């Protein structure tokens, strides 16, 4: 609903950046607080966003989901 209106009612009290969704502000606030709630179970790494943890886990699993467009290497 707010996607195309430009409305951003959620403002960061630290840097005044504005967001369309409250959960985007919540995630952004972790940059200011240093909170990293997502922990790797294989090493000491911690992450602000779960998507970053999922991407990091590929280091441990050896998963290489993207192939080179030129030689098909992964």
Curated annotation (Swiss-Prot):
PROSITE patterns: ZINC_FINGER_C2H2_1, ZINC_FINGER_C2H2_2. It comes from the Eukaryota. SUPFAM superfamilies: beta-beta-alpha zinc fingers. GO terms for cellular component: nucleus. Keywords: Developmental protein, DNA-binding, Gap protein, Metal-binding, Nucleus, Repeat, Zinc, Zinc-finger. It is found in: Nucleus. GO terms for biological process: segmentation. Its main location: nucleus. Pfam families: zf-C2H2 (PF00096). One of its GO terms (molecular function) is DNA-binding transcription factor activity, RNA polymerase II-specific. A zinc finger (C2H2-type) spans 1-4, 10-32, 38-60, 66-74. Belongs to the krueppel C2H2-type zinc-finger protein family. PANTHER family: MYONEURIN, ZINC FINGER PROTEIN. Krueppel is a gap class segmentation protein. This is Protein krueppel. It comes from Psychoda cinerea (Psychod fly).
């Amino acid at each position: 609903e707010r996607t195309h209106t430009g409305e951003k009612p959620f403002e960061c009290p630290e840097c005044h950046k504005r967001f369309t969704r409250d959960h985007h502000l919540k995630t952004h606030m972790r940059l200011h607080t240093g909170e990293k709630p997502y922990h790797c179970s294989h090493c000491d790494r911690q992450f602000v966003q779960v998507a970053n943890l999922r991407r990091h886990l590929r280091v441990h699993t050896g998963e290489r989901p993207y192939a080179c467009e030129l030689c098909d290497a992964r």
